[in-house]
């Protein structure tokens, strides 16, 4: 047949009057599960921004896989903040709910830049969070959300060797939505949420208050 008309509307499920008791009970049972309430670590200070959580995730990816550089897309961090105090299994699954797998890549500095810029389409809003390095970002003068160029630096502020190859770890979403050299990626049999849990259980206490690995440079 032929579609002659169509209509769609948004429904605010939080205000939707109808409920299904069976579904409500299933959700309550799931949310009250001791498995989800298990404490992994304690946040010594609050995580006050999505980037701060992303930096912690990058560090977790690096520590568990032995990679030199960690990268996480902003959309891969699904909560905006987390208070000081306990971090539970449920918190991690809310932070990273996608069943993503870790991917290790062997990339030069230039290839890392190309991967990140093709992923975010040169926009600051979607620029990934990082671990093991910092990023100096210069924006276009006429389009302040558009990235003109980025410089990768080591954690002690030295310029990264852009021709050297580095072991990079990310989730499977970034390589699937960016440009990378053929055959440079290797998917691990490790879910990223499990990696974060391993990291937190090992650390016991974490503090990332004020951590940022992106610096916006003024136009010269």
Predicted regions and their residues:
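Catalytic centers of hydrolytic enzymes
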Residues: 1-220
